[in-house]
Amino acid sequence: MNIVFRVDSSTKMGTGHLMRCLAFADEFNRQNKKTTFICRNLTGSSINLVKQKNHKVITLPIDTGFQSDNFYLDLLGATQEVDAQQTIEATSENIDLLIVDSYALDETWHKKLRPCVKKILVIDDLADKNIDCDVLLNQNLGSKKEDYKNKVPDDCRLLLDCEYALLRLEFGKLRSQALEKRKNTKRIKNILVSMGGNDTKNFTYDILQNVGDGFNITVVLGMLSPHNKMV
């Protein structure tokens, strides 16, 4: 089975889209399925992390002169039409499943890829656009079927709410240990702060400024975060 991911990461965009796709891809690898990532080589991209996890990576070129009034297209670094054509040209093999995780891509892009793939799965959070896919995953708390009324095909399978959260295998292995520790904890002493890989708006710093004394605080922040020194 040939599975292709179309997902990006960058200093401006962060790493969240990529990390949840990696959770997917690592599980597919454990099942001996072939995985390929198609990523635009944006500034601050975490493409090397994908390679370290033994997934094939195909990089799309950067158009340094591209600009868009659309916030998400500006992050994407290309129009949907150009991105779709580059994605098609990047894949010479038949694709069994195309997994797309991008706020910038809607049915315009999906329809152009349809002839090249058997199935499309879209990971979404916003429910703010029309999407042409066979399966839609929104793992966020409170996401519901009504959010996607008239926005997806009638036969689209919806995977909604936290029941479908994309968590790495490590979380599952430690779940029983964590639950046992929670039962025996009477006072909170340790606090973990994680606001994403890049935290471009520096929410981490704001939180640290407002946490009282007497706690052991651990911060998780990516190496490319622009606010590392301040934190």
Residue map of PLM features:
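Short N-terminal targeting/anchoring amphipathic segment
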Residues: I88-A104
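Conserved nucleotide-sugar donor-interacting segment of glycosyltransferase catalytic cores
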Residues: A104-V152
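Nucleotide-activated donor-dependent transferases that construct or modify glycoconjugates
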Residues: M1-G14
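A nucleotide-sugar donor-handling region in carbohydrate enzymes
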Residues: D132-K201, H227-N228
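Conserved nucleotide-sugar phosphate-binding/catalytic loop shared by glycosyltransferases and other
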Residues: Q31-Q85
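Short amphipathic alpha-helix
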Residues: L18-F28
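A conserved nucleotide-sugar
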Residues: K34, V211-L224, K229-M230
